[in-house]
Amino acid sequence: MGVLNISDQPPLVQAIFNRNADEVKLFLHKKDEVNALDQERRTPLHAAAWLGDVHIMDLLISAGANVNAKDHVWLTPLHRAAASRNERAVGLLLRKGADVTARDKYWQTPLHIAAANRATRCVETLLPHVSSLNMADRTGRAPLHHAAQSGYQEMVKLLLNKGANLSASDKKDRQPIHWAAYLGHLEVVKLLVSQGSDKSCKDKRGYTPLHAAAASGHVDVVKYLLRNGAEIDEPNAFGNTALHVACYTGQEAVANELVNRGANVNQPNHRGYTPLHLAAVSTNGALCLELLVNNGADVNMQSKEGKSPLHMAAIHGRFTRSQILIQNGGEIDCVDRYGNTPLHVAAKYGHELLISTLMTNGADTARQGIHGMFPLHLAVLYGSSDCCRKLLSSGQLYSIVLSMSKEHVLSAGFDINTPDNFGRTCLHAAASGGNIECLNLLLSSGADMNKKDKFGRTPLHYAAANGRYQCVVVLVGAGAEVNERDRSGCTPLHYSAASTAFCRTDRPHASTHQNQEDGEKESFLCVEHLLDNGADPCLCNTKGYSAVHYAAAHGNKQNLELLLEMCFNTLGDKESNGSISPLHLAVESGHWECVTVLIESGVCVDVCDPVGRSVLYLASQRGHSRCVELLLSQSASCLLAEHRSKWGPLHVAAANGHSECLRMLLCSEGGADLVNVTDAEGQTPLMLAVLGGHTDCVHLLLERGACPDMKDRRGRTALHRGAVMGREDCLTALLSHNVSVLSRDFQGRSALHLAASCGHADILSNLLSAADHSQPQDPLTDRHGYTPAHWAAYHGHEDCLEVLLELKPCSIQEGNPFTPLHCALINGHSGSAELLLESSVCNSLVNIRDAKGRTPLHAAAVAEDVAGLQLVLRQGADIDAVDHSGRSALMVAADYGQSGAVALLLHRAKADLSLLDVNKNTALHLACSKAHEMCAMLILKEIHNPILINATNSMLQMPLHIAARNGLATVVQALLNRGATVLAVDEEGHTPALACASNKAVADCLALILSTMKPSSSTASSSSPSSPSLNLLKHCGITAACPPLPNGGLRHGYGKDRHGATIGLDGCLTE
């Protein structure tokens, strides 16, 4: 209970704490509030239960005290009594109806409280009333967990005897033995193990009881677990053994026990760290490190990042440990994966004493590490002047020269001006780091301040970019050129103007607001100092940007003001040279304060960039409403449009859904007159808002007078766009403003056509309802006679077809005779076809013909939609119906090479193979003419009439001629086996053999050669006029190619229908 002054409590509570039952009776007789609450919502009964005064408790309960009252942390009087270990109070409360399952805010029941507080008798009193001994609190711990944590052996024994689950796990999978081991309760651990607890059980992170005991340094528990068979080198989920854990936590006694028991001192974890690595880095791991080294630990073993124990010691400056490692063979110049030695690491983290030790032991100060940097680079970059001084005093290049011969006999160290991989010297690093003492040390040691990196930047560029004012002052004072340009043409002033964008962010202080303000102040001082020392604010880089541009782009208001003061009247010249203006750059990133500064300096607010985008356009596009407001207050024009698409500010605001910017534009002077302004394609802001689905912008434009029926250059309105994109909310807004639902585009399509084509059923339903109110007699056809039903069927949108069948059933039979059923089947949408055939308005369409005489069965044959073919055949389709070119569905399938359709029509429907088209082609002719070998073979297997084998078409060609010409060897063999004649000639006088020739001229030549090879005989001399040689001589002078198989236009009939204007429904609205 909270500590309160008893004298401040009500008289009843004071009487309870004085244990004066008579006074309690008196106050209760005076009707004092028995359930009064203190500031922590505790009742008098809570106080009595905590005291354990059963008589007073009984008086309070008899007077109406609530036995289950909860205080501010949900503790009941029963919780209080259990915590006080008063079994009589617990018993009384239970008899008076106290809830034994009541939970506090941590979900702990009175049993949890009693187990945690060693209240054995209270637990014995509670046990007959609880249904489960293993109920978990908020952390998942059962009463046995709390008992094990308390270390009270009798409580643990009681709960186990009553059936508590020995292996109960909390939310981190920790069992009671984990907690007992971690807290060093050896007797409890022994008891749990004797009862069968798993001494090697693991929690969610793989920690065993041995890990837990090792972490907290309980060597007696460690010894007991090891004696009872605990695996000494068992790793956890991170690969750490108990020895890793002991070394990391500095538990030398445990580490000693583990090593003596044979623990592997060189076992790496998942990151490659051994116990020695962790001992080297640990706060209290010095003794552990010495122990490991003395017991054979590998002092040069490297982690997966290449770090040795000496690297780890260097990170935290463990001076003594580094000496031990070096004395025991630790490699001084061992490099990690980044090329850094321990000296690099010590220099980075500023451990001057450790640097001395490493250098004394021969560390190479000239070894290049990450990005080719010396240790000195890192020392000055991270601002350690002591380390810098130490490295300079011992590491600079020096030579010993013989006095007589002038011969160099010894040289060591490094050249202070040696660049890293990016051309940066130590002076560049010092200028970037900002430590003025390091900078002065380098300059006094001969560092070249005019040295440039690979990007042409001097140390002054780096100091300016990082806002290092003192470094800038020193470098400028030392003679650094303030107008020196780098390879991109930028001077130090450019970088200083935008220094907050280039400052390093890996320092812990860089994120605080105070340091951000300090950085902005230093940046301003850098700009001021550079300007005072001759920096030219009008110099532009290779892209035409000056320091003013940089300050504006990065929102540095103070720098911008200072630079503008120094630019005088040159800013207007910069704006007019065709490059992007500072105002554009400020607006693009939404730096409204910089926009204000630029406007006050007199810049033109209607300046445009090279592609014609005005500043207002850019602000509207990005949605920077403060900038838009500022520009409009200066009368920025809303009429200026960019060059390519002619979009203006209203277009981009609407297209990007920036409703606040759009509202400002519409409310500006003259803005209301631009509500219907069009771009190069004739699009209005309303169309673009609908296209993007920006409902708030749509409502705003409509309220401001936008015309919903305006059309673009292709005749499409905002409604067309909403129908294509499925913008239901936008369409609702348009419909509420009486938009013309049936407005047609240049192809005669309305929004209904497009909604049906794109499958937006809900939108189609709404549009149909609106159209029915406005123009109920409209046939809903486009220029080619197609209705929304055609489009829905063509794309297989069954939900749209259902809407049309329900709301506009008559439209199914209207329009182009190439019906919706044809459209569904030709694209293989059998589900849509079935839906149409099942409807009452379409049940007579199964044999309907289009303008070319084609039935739905023809369409299904083209698509090889087996399901569609079966569907129309079940509905009574005429299998042998022919179109105007004389072709049946089988002939169409053979012509298109749809072998599945051919097989179905032949085997199941028994299609007539003797049918001829207008050019006397059979199905076999058509299959061979397109080289559809599989179809030809299927047809051949079903031909039982030999006449069909040698049937000729209008050009006297047999299937053998055509198959031979197309190189169908399998079909030719089958035809020959079926008795196809090899001497029959076509109208060109060619036999099937000559038909194999690539063209007519080749065939003629082949015939001449064959004729000369024949032996002379009376039979040959008296050959009939129709013999091949005579016919060939008749045409031997003709060299034109043999004409193709006549098809009366049918060959391309369906192709045109699928891709042309008659059948092939072209794509819907594309933007």
From Swiss-Prot:
UniProt ANK repeat ranges: 7-36, 40-69, 73-102, 106-135, 139-168, 172-201, 205-234, 238-267, 271-301, 305-334, 338-367, 371-400, 422-451, 455-484, 488-539, 543-573, 578-607, 611-640, 645-674, 681-710, 714-743, 747-776, 784-814, 816-845, 852-881, 885-915, 919-951, 955-984
Taxonomic superkingdom: Eukaryota
Signal peptide range: none
InterPro entries found in the cross-reference section: Ankyrin_rpt, Ankyrin_rpt-contain_sf
Pfam families in the record: Ank (PF00023), Ank_2 (PF12796), Ank_5 (PF13857)
Keywords attached to this entry: ANK repeat, Repeat
Quaternary structure note: Protein phosphatase 6 (PP6) holoenzyme is proposed to be a heterotrimeric complex formed by the catalytic subunit, a SAPS domain-containing subunit (PP6R) and an ankyrin repeat-domain containing regulatory subunit (ARS).
Free-text function comment from the UniProt entry: Putative regulatory subunit of protein phosphatase 6 (PP6) that may be involved in the recognition of phosphoprotein substrates.
Protein name: Serine/threonine-protein phosphatase 6 regulatory ankyrin repeat subunit C
Annotated source species: Danio rerio (Zebrafish)
Gene coding for it: ankrd52
